[in-house]
Amino acid sequence: MSTRSRARKRSRVRSRTRRKDPIFVDGHRPRPMYVDYKDLELLSKMVNRQGRIMGRRKSGCTAASQHAVTAAIKRARFMALLPYVGE
């Protein structure tokens, strides 16, 4: 393998694009992180058809916002605003 092909392989490394958090797309995150448990439109997007909370990889949330979403979904379920089981 020549030096040229090694240099070419190194230059092909892709830069990672930062994904925007789907919960706070306007760029302003409230501190402390809080998601309203009465916002059923947002919470229903974070729950799959079976009623399970989607993971971070699938939802695209950061760790802090995923934790806030999980807490809000659990509160909404306790208040009977969201079902525990899906369809």
Curated annotation (Swiss-Prot):
Biased composition (Basic residues): 1-19
InterPro entries: Ribosomal_bS18, Ribosomal_bS18_sf
UniProtKB keywords: Ribonucleoprotein, Ribosomal protein, RNA-binding, rRNA-binding
Family matches, as Gene3D superfamilies: Ribosomal protein S18 (4.10.640.10)
A Gene Ontology biological process term: translation
Cross-referenced Pfam families: Ribosomal_S18
Disordered: annotated segments: 1-25
Gene Ontology MF term list: small ribosomal subunit rRNA binding; structural constituent of ribosome
One GO CC term on file: cytosolic small ribosomal subunit
Subunit structure: Part of the 30S ribosomal subunit. Forms a tight heterodimer with protein bS6.
Family: Belongs to the bacterial ribosomal protein bS18 family.
PANTHER family: 30S RIBOSOMAL PROTEIN S18 (PTHR13479), SMALL RIBOSOMAL SUBUNIT PROTEIN BS18M (PTHR13479:SF40)
Summary of the function given for this chain in its UniProt record: Binds as a heterodimer with protein bS6 to the central domain of the 16S rRNA, where it helps stabilize the platform of the 30S subunit.
Name of protein: Small ribosomal subunit protein bS18
Species in which this protein is naturally found: Rhodopirellula baltica (strain DSM 10527 / NCIMB 13988 / SH1)
